[in-house]
Each structure stands twice: as C-alpha cells, then as structure tokens.
C-alpha cells in the first residue's frame, strides 16, 4: 500500500493528466503570431519550409545557414508570406564562437526570443565506418556541441518568455542504422543531452520546454541524393514535416515523431522510459539546485 501511494498513484496521475491535456490541446497558427523564432539550417530543406510556415503565421523570423545568397531569398520570401519581420545571419556552426554570437545578434534583431529551432546538420555520406575519426568529431561538433552552445546562449532570453527549444533529430538517434555510425552517434547524443536537460528544467522549475523531433526519411534534396540506390523507402514531404515540428514546439510536447509509417511512433514511443525517469528523479535532492 505504501508503494502504491508513493509511486504508482503519482505515476498514474501524471500519465492520465499528460494524455488528457495532450488530446485536448489543439494547435492554432495564431500561437506563433508575433513570436520571435530562430531557425538554424534554414537556407533549404526542412529549415526553409519551417521559416515559410512561421512567416505565414505572422512570426518574427531569424534564419541562419552558411549560404548568404540562399538566406537572402528565404528572408525575401518570408516577408512576402506575411512575416512580422525577417532577418538572416550567415555563418557556420562549426565555429562555436559564431554560434554563441549569433544568438545574441538574433535577440538584438527581434528584441528577445520565444522559440529556438535547432535544425542544422553536418552532412555525412552513407558508408561503412572505417576509423574516420575526423568525420566523427565534426559530426559531434556540429550536430551536438553547437546545439548545446546555441541553447545555452539562448536560455536567458527563453527564461524571460517561458519559451521553447525545438531539437530536430532522427530515427537514427533512436535505433541502430547501418552506414551512418557518425551521424547516428550524434543524434543519440542529442537525445541523451536534451532529454536529461528537460528533466533538469522540470525539476528546477525552469519554464522552458524542450521538444525532440524524431524524423524518418524526408524528401529534401540532400536526403534524396544521399540515399539514392542505397536505401529503399518512401520519403515524407518536407512541407508537412516542417509544420509538424512547429506544432510540436508550440504545444510544448516532449517528442514529435514524423515518418510515413505509423509504426515509427508506435514502436519508438516508450512510456516505460517516462516511468523510469520519474522514479529516478525521486532519488535526487533537486531542491538544492532550484534558482542556482
């Protein structure tokens, strides 16, 4: 009976509340109207489509990528689509100093920050891993470390607005995928870092949500070229994928699954993990870290 009161009943209450509110909360485009949003990796593909969706919703959009010419076109199109404002800052996320300075610059451009969408990646060709440590290091730096730098730099602004961090990841960060060892390692690391960070935020009363987006194969030009003749699967549309990512961030969901197969979300969603996180957290004295 004591075990039920201490563990089972709180767990049941958490899950019932979670599913009730998740089922009854609907996304509305006006949730993003006037919001200040950063999108990285926004010169093409999913990032560009997210910028366009946000523009249609009336958000203030700041985009970044390496190609200045491409970013100029994205900003121009965002303004045509109805963005409250649109700005770009070109640079590479291989440079951690740039990553940190970019967040500060973006905050100056739009007067703060409500949502940070981390979408950029280091491209890695599909091939058998053969002691390419340079490739692995670069993947970890761009796909993980720069995400940490960006989110850390953005946190003071996001605390002020009870904002959101949206992390674009992959099925390759949930299951073993051949020919993508370096990429997969960086995506598994994203899950580990940001899922742990979410738990810390919740326990220390930091009202900033973290949404991890688990994507399957999406029909971007880069992805289609990478898998041609190697991987046989139907790709999902990037436009719809981009919208689902934004919805998940706006609704402050823990995870978003987007793939052409319903099996992806059914098999990868793990309620047991949430239970274990809850039980584990009970063993920590988190009160000493609140407001520190």
Swiss-Prot record:
The keyword Oxidoreductase applies. GO terms for molecular function: 7-beta-hydroxysteroid dehydrogenase (NADP+) activity; cortisol dehydrogenase (NAD+) activity; steroid binding. It comes from the Eukaryota. The keyword Transmembrane applies. Residues 1-7 are cytoplasmic. Keywords: Endoplasmic reticulum, Glycoprotein, Lipid metabolism, Membrane, NADP, Oxidoreductase, Signal-anchor, Steroid metabolism, Transmembrane, Transmembrane helix. The active site is at residue 183. Liver, kidney, lung, hypothalamus, anterior pituitary and placenta. Residues 25-292 are lumenal. The chain crosses the membrane at residues 8-24. It is a single-pass type II membrane protein. GO terms for cellular component: endoplasmic reticulum membrane. Pfam families: adh_short (PF00106). It is found in: Endoplasmic reticulum membrane. Glycans are attached at residues 95, 207. NADP(+) binds at residues 41-67, 92-93, 119-121, 183-187, 216-222. Its EC number is 1.1.1.146, 1.1.1.201. Its main location: endoplasmic reticulum. GO terms for biological process: steroid catabolic process. Controls the reversible conversion of biologically active glucocorticoids such as cortisone to cortisol, and 11-dehydrocorticosterone to corticosterone in the presence of NADP(H). Participates in the corticosteroid receptor-mediated anti-inflammatory response, as well as metabolic and homeostatic processes. Plays a role in the secretion of aqueous humor in the eye, maintaining a normotensive, intraocular environment. Bidirectional in vitro, predominantly functions as a reductase in vivo, thereby increasing the concentration of active glucocorticoids. This is 11-beta-hydroxysteroid dehydrogenase 1. It comes from Ovis aries (Sheep).
């Amino acid at each position: 009976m004591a075990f039920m009161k201490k563990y089972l009943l709180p767990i049941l209450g958490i899950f019932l509340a979670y599913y009730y509110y998740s089922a009854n909360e609907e996304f509305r485009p006006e949730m993003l109207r006037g919001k200040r949003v950063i999108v990285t990796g926004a010169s093409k593909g999913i990032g560009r489509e997210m910028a366009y969706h946000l523009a249609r919703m009336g958000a203030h959009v700041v985009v970044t990528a390496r190609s200045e010419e491409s970013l100029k076109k994205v900003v121009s199109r965002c303004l045509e689509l109805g963005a409250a404002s649109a700005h770009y800052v070109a640079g590479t996320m291989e440079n951690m100093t740039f990553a940190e300075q970019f967040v500060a610059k973006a905050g100056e451009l739009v007067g703060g920050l409500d949502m940070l969408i981390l979408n950029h990646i280091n491209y890695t060709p599909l091939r058998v891993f053969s002691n390419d440590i340079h490739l692995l290091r670069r993947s970890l730096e761009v796909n993980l470390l720069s995400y940490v730098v960006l989110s850390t730099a953005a946190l003071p602004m996001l605390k002020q607005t009870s904002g959101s961090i949206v992390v674009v990841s992959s099925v390759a960060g949930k299951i073993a995928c051949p020919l993508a060892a370096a990429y997969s390692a960086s995506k598994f690391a994203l899950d580990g870092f940001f899922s742990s960070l979410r738990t810390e935020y919740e326990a220390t009363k930091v009202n900033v949500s973290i949404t991890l987006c688990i994507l399957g194969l999406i029909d971007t030009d880069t992805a289609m070229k990478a898998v041609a003749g190697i991987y046989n699967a139907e790709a999902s549309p990037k436009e719809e994928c981009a919208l689902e990512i934004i919805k998940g961030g706006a609704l402050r969901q823990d995870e978003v699954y987007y793939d052409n197969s319903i099996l992806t979300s059914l098999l990868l969603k793990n309620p047991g993990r949430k239970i274990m996180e809850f039980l584990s957290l009970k063993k920590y004295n988190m009160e000493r870290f609140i407001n520190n």
